Amino acid sequence: MDIMRSVVGMVVLLAIAFLLSVNKKSISLRTVGAALLLQIAIGGIMLYFPPGKWAVEQAALGVHKVMSYSDAGSAFIFGSLVGPKMDVLFDGAGFIFAFRVLPAIIFVTALISLLYYIGVMGLLIRILGSIFQKALNISKIESFVAVTTIFLGQNEIPAIVKPFIDRMNRNELFTAICSGMASIAGSMMIGYAGMGVPIDYLLAASLMAIPGGILFARIPSPATEPSQVTFENLSFSETPPKSFIEAAASGAMTGLKIAAGVATVVMAFVAIIALINGIIGGIGGWFGFANASLESIFGYVLAPLAWIMGVDWSDANLAGSLIGQKLAINEFVAYLSFSPYLQTGGTLEVKTIAIISFALCGFANFGSIGVVVGAFSAISPKRAPEIAQLGLRALAAATLSNLMSA
């Protein structure tokens, strides 16, 4: 019965994606079928093949270690605002967006610029880009972006595609945005595991997001034009840097533009969502529902979908509410709310814990639209209107990808 319900849930998710498609006749059944089978196969390997799980876990730890070096630069500028003392200064609110996330964007962008300069990024694109290119019938740049989401998040993807963004067609751009939203960065995985979320679920969900992001990008936005992206004479900037130092400096300045764009738009989006919640709560108060909010509405709306995915009806409202928190706020807050249910002696079944853990594992939320618009617009202002148009549909597609992994 549970298996049948899960199969029905998969069909429902695919049907929703089909309804969102802008060109239903151009959907490639080969790409969709191969991506779906690959998503299922990766889930099985990660959960039941220990060497595969160990390899990805070590890679995630390595990325986390590299990302941690950005704290050295941040600490030099911000002093004790960054580091272990953050918990003391901010009464436990250690995850400070301005002092952790934004400096990391600058550091990673500078590092990527260096990797382009010495030729490493070109080599990675050719190798990683070929992995899924033929199997899924997609372009090399789409495959490369999808694979790198295991290690880097949506904040860093604009830096990766900067040399190509003006040549990427609309479908490739949509796939890049969707892949970023459907995944979580390897560095974030460690933090969520620290909240009690089983690391094997996080690792499996992270890898399943590669074909999942492609699957749910290619149904709403099928490929209708050939790729114009080439990989000769790769350079991170319009004028190729002449030295190691120039490459790092130009990358850092680009990172600053991306960080500023992300911070500006995210502030606006979070404030707008708070305003919407205030309006909903105010109206709800007239009818005795003063605590009504976007996430609570999503909780009720998504409860039936959670049940179809395999959650018992008694826990469906909780699952829907957590997914609603992820959509309306972010996955960090949702996992924080989920954490008490993961403690020893919890009331949730193992199956329910697994489904919720997978469903929350991704950056797909309304704030991410702001991140995407701000970051991509910073590196390609002329494509900003197009990126803004794709944001909401990419959010829907990435959310469906997360739910399919569950």
Predicted stretch roles:
Residues R126-I160, P226-A247, A292-F298, L322, ...:
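Juxtamembrane inter-helical linkers in multi-pass membrane proteins
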Residues M253-T344:
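Transmembrane helical segments that form the transport core of multi-pass membrane transport proteins
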Residues I45-L81, T230, I276-V301, S314-L322:
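Interfacial/capping segments of alpha-helical transmembrane domains
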Residues A135-G194, G320-S405:
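Alpha-helical membrane segments and immediately flanking helix-loop junctions
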Residues M1-V11, R100, A292-S293, I356-N365:
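Structural signature of hydrophobic alpha-helical transmembrane segments
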Residues S68-I138:
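Hydrophobic alpha-helical hairpins/lids featuring a short glycine-rich hinge
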